[in-house]
């Protein structure tokens, strides 16, 4: 009888360990292949080591001083100017 209970507990614990291991491995691969590219998610997790998807300069003050350094930066909705209508 105790043999059956022990075997049942062993199978239960082994199943939990395998499921947890698969979840951790899945999260690791998804993080490194996709999620680490988003600066917002890196800030939430506190990961400063992986800078793969970050194309910004290390210090924000340098980027603010030279606006011509990033010509591809989109303006926010507040900064956009409506198109000029010439009346044609």
Swiss-Prot record:
It is found in: Membrane. InterPro entries: DUF4750. Residues 48-88 are annotated as: Disordered. It comes from the Eukaryota. It is a single-pass membrane protein. The chain crosses the membrane at residues 10-30. One of its GO terms (cellular component) is membrane. Residues 72-81 have a biased composition (Basic residues). The modification Phosphoserine is found at residues 59, 61, 70. Belongs to the SMIM13 family. This is Small integral membrane protein 13. It comes from Rattus norvegicus (Rat). The lineage of its organism: Eukaryota, Metazoa, Chordata, Craniata, Vertebrata. The gene is Smim13.
